[in-house]
């Protein structure tokens, strides 16, 4: 079921769970999540749960998409955001409506190709895609004043820290694959990096190397 009432119930739940950024909530309200999942799962698209998208990947839980987006924007608007892990393209689509430009890296080409098609369908034109190793980021276009990582790393990749602009913010899950991990907010400051642990999460692992 993809009715407006179903979407409104999801927005109400996100608000009750602590998402308070009105712009984030509005973007999630108007973005058709059912386009980002297989047709067989479309009836579950507005449940607050992660869903499989193939290739051992998932579309993230709406709360997590909202929460990570809100954290990224906590200090104000951003004009240049790097996304590690395009996946279904849902988080990408949300970001594209919240920031000026999104640069999205995905290692699984078939997923990225589908995500591109969905964003074109939604007329979101401010996203540039790269097929490659997310652990390496996208150094040629660095620095970024926001980085969002949608897969868990055992530790924060140094390459991503290096690509964060002064004052920039990174939201990333850190910890062992298949176990409870910690969501972290990292801010690049004059004397280094501040790190804030935001709570337990579970994400698929951030893997090396592109995959056709």
UniProtKB/Swiss-Prot annotation:
Gene of this entry: pcm
Per its record, what are the GO molecular function terms?
A: protein-L-isoaspartate (D-aspartate) O-methyltransferase activity
The active site consists of: 60
EC number(s): the record gives: 2.1.1.77
Catalysis performed (reactions)? [protein]-L-isoaspartate + S-adenosyl-L-methionine = [protein]-L-isoaspartate alpha-methyl ester + S-adenosyl-L-homocysteine
Family membership: Belongs to the methyltransferase superfamily. L-isoaspartyl/D-aspartyl protein methyltransferase family.
Is Oxidoreductase among this UniProt entry's keywords? no
Provide the function of this protein. Answer: Catalyzes the methyl esterification of L-isoaspartyl residues in peptides and proteins that result from spontaneous decomposition of normal L-aspartyl and L-asparaginyl residues. It plays a role in the repair and/or degradation of damaged proteins.
**Which keywords label this protein?**
Cytoplasm, Methyltransferase, S-adenosyl-L-methionine, Transferase
- GO annotation terms (biological process): methylation; protein modification process; protein repair
Matching SUPFAM superfamilies: S-adenosyl-L-methionine-dependent methyltransferases
Put simply, this protein is called Protein-L-isoaspartate O-methyltransferase
GO CC, any one term? cytoplasm
The species is Pseudomonas entomophila (strain L48)
Q: Does the keyword section mention Membrane? A: no
């Amino acid at each position: 079921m993809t009715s407006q009432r179903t979407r409104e119930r999801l927005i109400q739940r996100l608000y009750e769970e602590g998402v308070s950024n009105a712009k984030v909530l509005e973007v999630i309200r108007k973005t058709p999540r059912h386009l980002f999942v297989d047709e067989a799962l479309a009836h579950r698209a507005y449940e607050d749960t992660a869903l499989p998208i193939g290739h051992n990947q998932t579309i993230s839980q709406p709360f997590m998409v909202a929460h990570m987006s809100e954290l990224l924007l906590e200090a104000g608007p951003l004009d240049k955001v790097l996304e590690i892990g395009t996946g279904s393209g849902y988080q990408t689509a949300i970001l594209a409506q919240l920031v000026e430009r999104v640069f999205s890296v995905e290692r699984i080409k078939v997923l990225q190709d589908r995500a591109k098609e969905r964003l074109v369908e939604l007329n979101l034109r401010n996203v540039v895609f790269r097929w490659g190793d997310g652990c390496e980021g996208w150094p040629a276009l660095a620095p970024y004043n926001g980085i969002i990582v949608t897969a868990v790393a055992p530790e924060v990749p140094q390459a991503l820290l290096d690509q964060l602009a002064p004052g920039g913010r990174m939201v990333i899950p850190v910890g062992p694959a298949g176990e409870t991990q910690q969501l972290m907010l990292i801010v690049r400051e004059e004397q280094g990096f501040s790190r804030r642990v935001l709570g337990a999460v579970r994400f698929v692992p951030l893997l090396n190397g592109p995959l056709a």
